[in-house]
């Protein structure tokens, strides 16, 4: 990847380069890339994780992105507590849990994970219909009730319960950062469905896009029947998703 980036800097001077890596690795990669360059530095490369990418995209279009919400995280938590109180009579298994102050934060985090995997109230209902375990059925249906009511209440306040990654996806086409950009994605071992949406959008908008996947050999030569047990099962999943 570093070699290709150096080549782009030579062949296309001044054109923006985005190197997307896991958030904890950004500073290490910046240092390694700087040391790799002949001049021991670079000016046109943005080494970012998903969070920093979002910040720079919003900054480029004069938007605060996720921070534009008039409701803080605490405000959303309070709103969720209000929703659960209103729906208490419809809840059986979760009724006692709703009385605990910390449960709204737990539920908020759960809804955040649902959004990352593109799971909504209707998906929870379908999941409840497909399982045979009665307790799991009830839990899924009660979660669907809470999530649906929460989304409706947010809508009444002019808010959306949207995944932060999907906000970046919506903002990217407006960003001048993508003009004649070269995008490189490196160091990831798995992605959520919303991450894939962002990757596809980056690939559509970029002049050039490259993603690296750590695999021991050509994917087609691996034992397909035992892929799930393979040490590289997650990178293989990325490969299968991207080439599908």
Locate the predicted segments by residue.
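Conserved SF1/SF2 helicase motif Ia
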Residues: 5-17
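Short, surface-exposed basic-aromatic patches at helix termini and helix-loop junctions that form
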Residues: 10, 34-40, 200-205
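Short catalytic/ligand-binding loop motif for oxyanion handling, primarily in non-cytosolic enzymes
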Residues: 26-29, 54-56, 192-193, 218-221
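Short regulatory helix/loop adjacent to the ATP-binding pocket of P-loop NTPases
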Residues: 32-36, 222-225
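Conserved helicase NTPase motor core
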Residues: 73, 123-242
